[in-house]
Amino acid sequence: MPIEIRRFGVGHRRPDGPPGTVGIEGRVLESRAAGSITELAFGRSAHMAPHSNPRWTCFLVIEGGGWTGVGDERTRVLAGEAVIWPPDVLHAAWTEGTPMRAIVVELAEDPRLLAASRAGDGAAAGAAPRPVSKGEGRLADRPHRRRAGDDGQGEPD
């Protein structure tokens, strides 16, 4: 199967969100019965109108920060944080003075149960984790292979 590339980001978004949403653009990257993946870009003072959907939703903030609400709770959320919105519960997200980017993953199944089943222990959500021994190892050495004329290309040293 060939590699499939899906572009997102600036130039690939369109206005997105439920009715009443202001200042948000997005790009659906994948959508099927099992779930969907969407990139959202919130401008300054943007807001996603409170809404619910029948799927579990993981709201993964990848840049900037803003606010999220689930039911009656409200909290600040920053890049590197993920919020789990349960199905059929009102949820929203918004920004004030700064923009925010997020990846939204909607799943037909509870992601906490998926993680437990992938770990092989079949533990229910909220169960105590199994103790594991400390891993040993290190990253493999990567030889430095800079070619003449490559000074301005790629990642910094």
Enumerate the predicted regions with their spans.
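A short, N-terminal "cap"/entry segment at the start of jelly-roll beta-barrel domains
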Residues: 1-35, 83, 115-157
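Conserved short histidine dyad/triad with adjacent acidic residue
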Residues: 36-53
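Short beta-strand His + acidic residue motifs that chelate non-heme Fe in jelly-roll/DSBH
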Residues: 48-50, 68-69, 85, 91-97
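Glycine- and acidic-residue-biased ligand/ion/polar-headgroup-sensing regions
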Residues: 55-66, 71
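Short acidic-glycine-tyrosine-enriched beta hairpin
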Residues: 72-87
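Ligand-binding loop in jelly-roll beta-barrel domains
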Residues: 87-113
